[in-house]
Amino acid sequence: MLRNGFIIQSQESIYKMIYVLEDDNSIREFVVYTLCHMDLEAKGFERPSEFWAGMEETLPSLILLDIMLPEEDGLSVLKKLREHADTKEVPVIMLTAKDSEYDK
């Protein structure tokens, strides 16, 4: 069922889908590989535009979201997710490779 530009699916059909939005290829591939070897479905996206296109196809049960991204940062992606009725309840885990005191 299509509602507000997003496909709505039963809870059973999205139970294991995890989206990974990470622009660093090696990190994205590692995370997706690890999740898949845990018998979970995972799909990686390099850019927010690809991620939004994926969201129109399938709503995931979890999103792993990088903070620093091309096109728009992860915090603005999170804000958009929380503003939309169909995605505001999707759990999001923020990822970052930043480790300096300034970044904390």
Language model segments and positions:
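Conserved Asp/Asn-Gly motif in the active-site loop of CheY-like receiver
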Residues: 24, 45-49, 104
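Acidic, metal-coordinating helix/loop segments flanking the phosphotransfer/catalytic sites
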Residues: 44-62
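His-Asp phosphorelay/catalytic-motif detector in bacterial-type signaling
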Residues: 59-61, 86-91
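Active-site residues of response regulator receiver
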Residues: 66, 96
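The feature encodes the CheY-like receiver
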Residues: 70, 100
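Short, conserved "switch-loop" micro-motifs in signal-transduction and mechanochemical regulators
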Residues: 84, 98-99
